[in-house]
Design a protein with these regions (language model features):
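C-terminal hydrophobic helical "lid"/dimerization subdomain
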Residues: 2-11, 237, 283-334
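A short N-terminal beta-strand-loop micro-motif at the entrance of redox/enzyme domains
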Residues: 2-6, 20-48
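Glycine-rich beta-strand-centered segment in the early N-terminal region that forms part
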Residues: 34-50, 64-109
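Glycine-rich phosphate-binding loop and adjacent beta-alpha segment
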Residues: 202, 232-295, 334
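Short, well-ordered loop/turn sites that connect or cap secondary structure elements
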Residues: 96-97, 154, 243
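Mid-domain Rossmann-like dinucleotide-binding core that forms the NAD(H)/NADP(H) cofactor-binding site
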Residues: 135-207
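NAD(P)H dinucleotide-binding glycine-rich loop of Rossmann-like/cofactor-binding domains
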Residues: 72-84, 102-163
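Short amphipathic alpha-helix with an adjacent loop that forms part of the alpha/beta core around
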Residues: 210-220
Length: 334
């Protein structure tokens, strides 16, 4: 790893590129410098990345909406699809980030799987230096969860259901319980019986969401249902069907389709509220995530269950695609 001479002159750095479905290729690309930076951007030296569920369609070869996703068999974009990153600032045009700072946040170009990453400084924040990079990278999804829950009614004393208990769903369960939820129900066909309680889940439902809804008693419907699956249209409808009268549905899962069929009759007759949206105010919520993790020191070590080196990217993504009960968050480190 490190700088090498480019055949055409100059230095090169490593990057990964999806060249076919389920297939990464390591490539050498020209070194990036401060001259690559626009206003409020920073240049990071890669320290760690986290694999998000939203990265997996790209790994499988699905065509995304990014302008550069023009490959014949896969995206063929340097660094794609990683957006959860930890890095050391090596050049900056953002007044809040200086050379040598270690920061966590978003690779704004979804190109974080490379040695040098150019990204928007407004999506980065410093983190507790006691954290290792593989644990610090989990602050990014935690920030997303904290921001999303800010958009909902108070969780205190409420019954919350989280559809999907993959890494982001388990984070929702944990934070909901920490914020005072009376009961947290976690729904997933993966067996989370061994770890659900550790993440605040009171009732672990090992079933698909349609099966869960079909057996849900009218008196036990949650006031808030969080859809944390995404990438297909069915589970949002199940979340709406499951929600108690006057309740709220949060659609957090990333949509792969433009249009989702939902029952407006159920929405209307049950006085439901449907919320969705992306994470804004990113530097603030990254700082909030750092503080939340400080108050809950057991969280990040329990959450990041598997760590791979940058020479093991293929294996890391293959594990992320497998429904494995003991696997939660996967980090990739330098």
């Amino acid at each position: 790893m490190g700088l090498e001479q480019h055949p055409g002159g100059g230095l090169t750095v490593w990057a990964y590129r999806l060249v076919a479905p389920y297939t990464f290729e390591r490539v050498d690309i020209p070194e990036k410098t401060s001259e690559c930076l626009g206003d409020r951007q920073v240049l990071l030296h890669f320290l760690a990345a986290g694999i998000c569920g939203s990265d997996l369609p790209g790994f499988r070869g699905a065509k995304g909406r990014l302008a550069g996703d023009t490959g014949l068999s896969a995206a063929e974009m340097d660094g794609f699809p990683i957006h959860e990153v930890v890095g050391e600032v090596i050049a900056s045009r953002h007044r809040s980030h200086g050379v040598g700072d270690r920061v966590v946040g978003w690779a704004s170009g979804f190109d974080g799987l490379m040695e040098y990453v150019v990204t928007d400084g407004d999506g980065l924040a410093p983190y507790d230096p006691a954290l290792t990079p593989q644990h610090a990278v989990a602050l990014q999804p935690l920030a997303c969860v904290l921001y999303a829950l800010e958009q909902l009614p108070s969780l205190k004393g409420s019954h919350i259901a989280v559809v999907g208990q993959e890494p982001i769903g388990l984070l929702f369960s944990y934070v909901a319980k920490a914020f005072g939820a009376r009961q947290v129900t976690g729904v997933d066909p993966i067996d989370r019986g061994g770890i659900g309680e550790e993440f605040g889940v009171d009732t672990i439902v090992r079933a698909t969401s349609d099966r869960w809804v079909s057996h849900l008693d009218a008196s036990d419907r949650p006031e808030i249902v969080i859809e944390a699956v995404g990438h297909q249209v069915a589970t949002l409808g199940h979340a709406i069907e499951a929600t108690a009268f006057g309740g709220t549905v949060l659609y957090f899962g990333v949509p792969d389709d433009d249009s989702y069929p939902i029952s407006m009759r159920t929405m209307l007759r049950n006085n439901l509220t449907l919320k969705s949206g992306v994470t804004l105010d990113r530097r603030r919520v990254l700082r909030a995530a750092n503080e939340f993790a400080r108050k809950h020191p057991e969280l990040l070590t329990a959450y990041v269950t598997h760590t791979f080196g940058v020479d093991e990217v293929q294996a890391a993504f293959e594990l992320a695609c497998r429904p494995t009960p003991e696997r939660i968050k996967i980090a990739i480190v330098e």
